[in-house]
Amino acid sequence: MAKKSVTKKKNVKKNIARGIVCISASFNNTNVTITDEMGNVLCWATAGGLGFKGSKKSTPYAAQQAVESAMEKAKEHGIKEVGIKVQGPGSGRETAVKSVGAVEGIKVLWLKDITPLPHNGCRPPKRRRV
């Protein structure tokens, strides 16, 4: 029986000047996704993917490292200007936004908070008793 040949997908480096940094900061992890203006994903990074495990994923330092990793990948695509979308209540929100602004050679154009707020929707989970 003949073996199937596995073809590896090539990472195509695009030359894009503007992008959008989407930061999703949950209570457990921080996701950073960098897209072009149409919404096509160029690169991404997560705190858990960088080696932070357990409760360390939700720290501001882990969020900062995730942003720095994603922005290094984005520079390979030629991104010079970004807009920032922030979603979620996590502890890494402010640190992630500050570290996007601190990256050399990348200018921040705008900042939006797109956290969904319920108009009295589902009942929230009960308070923790520790």
From Swiss-Prot:
GO biological process: translation
UniProt entry tagged with the keyword rRNA-binding: yes
Domain of life: Bacteria
Cited Gene3D superfamilies: Ribosomal protein S11
PROSITE patterns the record matches: RIBOSOMAL_S11 (PS00054)
Record Pfam families: Ribosomal_S11
The UniProt record lists the keyword Manganese: no
GO MF annotation terms: rRNA binding; structural constituent of ribosome
GO CC terms in record: ribonucleoprotein complex; ribosome
Keywords: Ribonucleoprotein, Ribosomal protein, RNA-binding, rRNA-binding
InterPro entries: Ribosomal_uS11, Ribosomal_uS11_bac-type, Ribosomal_uS11_CS, Ribosomal_uS11_sf
Function in brief: Located on the platform of the 30S subunit, it bridges several disparate RNA helices of the 16S rRNA. Forms part of the Shine-Dalgarno cleft in the 70S ribosome.
Subunit comment: Part of the 30S ribosomal subunit. Interacts with proteins S7 and S18. Binds to IF-3.
Family of the protein in this entry: Belongs to the universal ribosomal protein uS11 family.
Protein name in the entry: Small ribosomal subunit protein uS11
